[in-house]
Amino acid sequence: MGEIARAAGVAVGTLYRHFPNKTDLLAAVVNEYVEALADDAQDAWERVEAGRSDAAQELLGFLGRALEMIFRSHAAKTVARALGAEVEYAEPETRATEALGRLIEEGRASGRLRSDLTVSDLYVLMVFYPGDGSPEVRRRWLELIRPGLLGHGG
């Protein structure tokens, strides 16, 4: 914890006041990523709802950003899981699922997304993404799955 406090530029006591141990600190880091993903999904829907963007474009953009977050959080999630850290997924997952569901519904209605696409499909794709991939791997992965997401009008 001392090394982490030095790197963060805070006193060790300050770090311990907020996070009693490394497991709690890692859980907080992973929670931040999960919350950020949910916020991003909601922001994407809000842009579509306000008429500032297209649902298919926002969904693909969200996936790209989500993959970047998956890459950045990969090590923290692995260590947190190994230490048995308690990560709160329920509330942010509900927010993300609702926002992504609205994006998909709008995209299907416009014909830009395939008519049978579901939020579960997106989650399956994200789970099987190789989280330690380079930017080139992420770009190629998105390029390969894009045709499977888009409808005939996409």
Q: Which residues fall in each region the model found?
A:
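C-terminal peripheral helix-coil segments that are non-catalytic and often amphipathic
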Residues: 98, 102-112, 125-154
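Amphipathic alpha-helical interaction segments
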Residues: 3, 24, 57-65, 121-124, ...
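Short secondary-structure transition hinges
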Residues: 24, 61-102, 127-131
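Short, hydrophobic secondary-structure boundary micro-motifs
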Residues: 75-82, 112-117, 153-154
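Generic hydrophobic, amphipathic alpha-helix propensity
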Residues: 4, 29-33, 37, 100
